UniProtKB/Swiss-Prot annotation:
One BP annotation, GO: 2,4,6-trinitrotoluene catabolic process
Cofactors (names): FMN
Top EC group: oxidoreductase
Protein known as: Putative NAD(P)H nitroreductase
One Gene Ontology CC term in the entry: cytosol
Gene Ontology molecular functions: oxidoreductase activity
Annotated binding of NAD(+), by residue: 155-160
Homology family: Belongs to the nitroreductase family.
Organism: Haemophilus influenzae (strain ATCC 51907 / DSM 11121 / KW20 / Rd)
EC number: 1.-.-.-
Keyword field contains Membrane: no
Length: 220
């Protein structure tokens, strides 16, 4: 694999900018979008939990149903090439069947599984206090989905594809709408965040960011 230069890496991030208006005549190829999804699937997550699912919503009727409560992507639902809604796992306790599957994927033997469970219990109960209420535990899983989201956005930029991460919608109504469509079990998952992908239809103003010296503090 040819290694990118530092300049090429940074160019991907300068090039990526939240796209509000897409060209509806330009569609992402199946191969390119599968690559973007793989960027999400291959992302890291806390204790390798992978507490996410990716809903790729291409159905125009469903997108239309989403408009009344999706103010943050009202201009994009008609014109973006692809829409992804990322779900986060609910009730991902260390002693749940979900974590049994996590350990099975890792190929752990019985002794290793018990050691892992002990660590997961300490993490959730003591280190992060995730078991205080259902929302705290869900938010932990939701944080993991943002790692996958970021990698999908950067992967898209590497392919010359534009994107926009979106939180601008009514979460209860979005959950209700998608669950009623049978897209997920609301007892097991809930909406975390969304993103649109496609090709921009107009120029985007140069992004403004804080200087490196404002956000970085070296210690030692």
């Amino acid at each position: 694999m040819t290694q990118l230069t530092r300049e090429q890496v940074l160019e991907l991030f300068h090039q990526r900018s939240s796209t509000r208006y897409y060209d509806p005549t330009k569609k992402i190829s199946d191969e390119d979008f599968e690559c973007i999804l793989e960027c999400g699937r291959l992302s890291p997550s806390s204790v390798g939990s992978e507490p996410w699912k990716f809903l790729v919503i291409q159905n125009k009727t469903l997108r239309e149903k989403m408009k009344p409560f999706s103010w943050g992507m009202i201009n994009q639902l008609d014109n973006c090439s692809h829409l992804v809604v990322i779900l986060a796992k609910k009730n991902a306790r260390y002693d749940s069947p979900f974590f049994v599957d996590v350990m099975a994927r890792k190929g752990l033997n019985a002794e290793q599984q018990q050691a892992a469970l002990t660590k997961y219990k300490a993490l959730q109960e003591e280190d992060m206090k995730l078991l205080e209420n259902d929302r705290t535990l869900f938010d932990w899983c939701s944080k993991q989905t943002y790692i996958a989201l970021a990698n999908m956005l950067t992967g898209a930029s590497a392919l010359g594809i534009d994107s926009c991460p979106i939180e601008g919608f009514h979460y209860d109504k979005m959950n209700e709408c998608l669950a009623e469509e049978g897209l997920f079990d609301p007892q097991e998952y809930a909406v975390s965040v969304a993103a649109t992908f496609g090709y921009r239809s107009r120029d985007i103003a140069k992004k403004s960011r804080k200087g490196l010296d404002e956000v970085v503090k070296w210690v030692g």
